Design a protein with these regions (language model features):
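Feature recognizes metal-dependent phosphohydrolase scaffolds
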Residues: 1-315
Length: 315
């Protein structure tokens, strides 16, 4: 269980929905969507500022923190479209049914990514965090802020039925407890991050008691472009970081972007999820008050250096 200094407890003694980050270097991983290779390659890569240690070594030594924005399950992009549609055809035609090769491949990729996330948390402690996304809902629940979903096919219901058929009810209940334990927001010195843009202003007290507030959970994992209340990002930054004139930003995934990133909320929100790119965002906390710089890096093969491809100046 994480330290209360890192993740303050709620009234019942459980970890709350806010994670505090104090490392100088923070690496933010956009929506995984079954891309275990992206996360593995990142951990085995070298950051240009630290050429003598891999990212996983930096995280273990307390030099950096890796923050995943959730959505660990269900492939997206061109490969996701192909595989989900093939699995849906097999289900409808009855040729192979639910337990088809396409469905096994899809769920195998999702579970591979999930197991890597679950392994890294105890291995790296405060050096690794995974926030909750709307796809982190293996049983396709409509409770506790979650909603059933579909995109290319009936991913939610098909995935839940497959998991139950392969592993039974008991493991599904365990996975539900795990999903509900995920934090919603990570806060550094001059930035916050969540899966989706905050629908309404959020504050530390609300995040602390998130387990009993399904509306809050939904507002941080399901908000689409143009749905957030005006000023919600800035008010949330003030509440979580304290009022200040320095450059600050909220970083999110959820909605895909066409290039490296997109600004929203008057450049105070930075979206970084492009399912066709193997990219991460890197922040140096408190490096300068003249302006915030978020660097976007391409993740290559294990053992290579992260390659800087773009930079953003939100706030």
């Amino acid at each position: 269980m994480e330290s209360p200094d890192l993740r303050p407890r709620d009234k019942s003694g459980f970890p709350g929905g806010l994670v505090r980050l104090d490392q100088d270097l923070v690496i933010i991983v956009p929506d995984l969507h079954a891309r275990s290779q992206l996360l593995y390659s990142l951990t085995a890569s070298f950051h240009p500022d630290h050429p003598s240690a891999t990212v996983v070594e930096l995280a273990h030594e307390g030099v950096c923190a890796i923050v995943c924005l959730g959505d660990v399950l269900h492939t997206e992009g061109a490969e996701g479209v192909r595989r989900w549609r093939e699995a849906a055809r097999n289900l409808v035609t009855g040729r192979e049914g639910l337990l088809s090769a396409a469905m096994d491949q899809e769920m195998g990729a999702s579970l591979h990514a999930l197991l890597l996330v679950i392994f890294l948390k105890p291995a790296l402690g405060k050096g690794f965090h995974c926030l909750k996304g709307n796809h982190d809902n293996l049983t396709n629940s409509s409770e506790n802020g979650d909603l059933p979903f579909y995109k290319y096919a009936m991913e939610g219901s098909m995935g839940a039925a497959w998991f139950n058929a392969r592993y039974g009810d008991g493991l599904g209940e365990e996975m539900r407890r795990y999903e509900r334990s995920l934090a919603l927001v990570a806060a550094g010195r001059d930035f916050c991050a969540s899966h989706a843009e905050p629908l309404l202003p959020v504050n530390p007290a609300e995040l602390l008691e998130y387990r009993s507030n399904p509306g809050l959970v939904r507002s941080l994992i399901w908000t689409g472009n143009g749905e957030a209340a005006e000023g919600s990002v800035e008010a949330s930054l003030d509440a979580l970081l304290g009022p200040g004139a320095g450059p600050r930003a909220w970083i999110s995934g959820h909605r895909p972007v066409a290039g490296s990133f997109e600004y929203r909320a008057g450049r105070k929100l930075l979206q970084i999820h492009n399912p066709e790119r193997t990219q991460v965002a890197c922040l140096r906390q408190g490096r300068t008050k003249a302006g915030m710089i978020v660097e976007l890096y391409k993740v290559g093969h294990p053992g290579s250096f992260l390659q800087r491809v773009d930079s953003a100046c939100p706030g």
